[in-house]
Amino acid sequence: VPNRNKIFSSIIQSVALSIANETKSPVQIAMGIHAGDHAIYPDCRQEFRDADYKAFCEGNWDSERVSAYTPYLDVDKFDILKDGESCCECLGIDFDEVYKRTNTSYKPIKFFHTSTRWKWYSDYKSASSVERIEAFIKLGRPDPVAYADETGPVNWETAKIHAEELLYDWAVDKGRD
């Protein structure tokens, strides 16, 4: 999605500045942009974030009350998952319960399910899903999110094998360059 992080940051910057002005206190925006997206989305790079913040400051009075927190700017999804695992442990919450409720898929799939009527699943073939699956493989634990394809729900092993095959093919192709 071209320019998506600029769109998101514009919205959140305006909300944050409104809150900062109303409360007369600073507001920090947390953004989950990460290094894994740098090659695909230029608006995930530090240079873009700096330019975006400069434009925000130039266009708004009291903009210094708003700052950005981008803890994952230089790390990939694996490092984000490690941090999430650590945070869940510190907070005493179940990692799987948290992460089964997240969906990074650009192509979620909706299927009828007898107990819940309609249920949304993550696809496991899109680039964002493969990147997520790769991070869970590196972490050494199954991804608790529900996956599906055009035929219906699939288990973690199916999603994992598909991602591993794609990653292997990509590595082989990259070696030919």
Kindly give the residue locations of the regions a language model identified:
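Nucleotide-activated chemistry modules centered on ATP-dependent adenylation/adenylyltransferase
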Residues: 1-177
